UniProtKB/Swiss-Prot annotation:
This is 5'-deoxynucleotidase YfbR. The lineage of its organism: Bacteria, Pseudomonadati, Pseudomonadota, Gammaproteobacteria, Enterobacterales. Belongs to the 5DNU family. It is found in: Cytoplasm. Residues 30-142 form the HD domain. A divalent metal cation. Highest activity with Co(2+), followed by Mn(2+) and Cu(2+). The keyword Nucleotide-binding applies.
Amino acid sequence: MKQSHFFAHLSRLKLINRWPLMRNVRTENVSEHSLQVAMVAHALAAIKNRKFGGNVNAERIALLAMYHDASEVLTGDLPTPVKYFNSQIAQEYKAIEKIAQQKLVDMVPEELRDIFAPLIDEHAYSDEEKSLVKQADALCAYLKCLEELAAGNNEFLLAKTRLEATLEARRSQEMDYFMEIFVPSFHLSLDEISQDSPL
């Protein structure tokens, strides 16, 4: 039986830091970001289903979000100002991402490939799935900005403003609900969010 390097590669997502051009109070890696995006994407899907008549598979959305940046283990996390410097660079980077996604899929044993390929290849996502994962991705980047700003790091002021515009462009009922119910707590200290806890 042939060995696969697939999970050994994915394990290295924890070595790739996000926001590489920014001074960070706390460094965030791609692995922990992916977990947070999965949790938020799952919540958005659940909110959509429960509150707004949606019919999406929240567990699949969480899985897609877990793998949404998997190709960065081969490409690295390119800083946003570089990635979107102009349309040509953005287009070329998308092509590089596609190649990296295919390379990861090719690492999976053939008998399992049909399970993992639709998780890694974003072209297999439905429009609704892609929208929910992108909303969650932007929300988590926004939450990172709030955390950095709360810690006194003004380096993230412009990023927060840019992400507010992104969130507005991707706005949905489920995102509005999440922003109203869950996001305000990110402005609070540990003591403040623990006041109601019996522990």
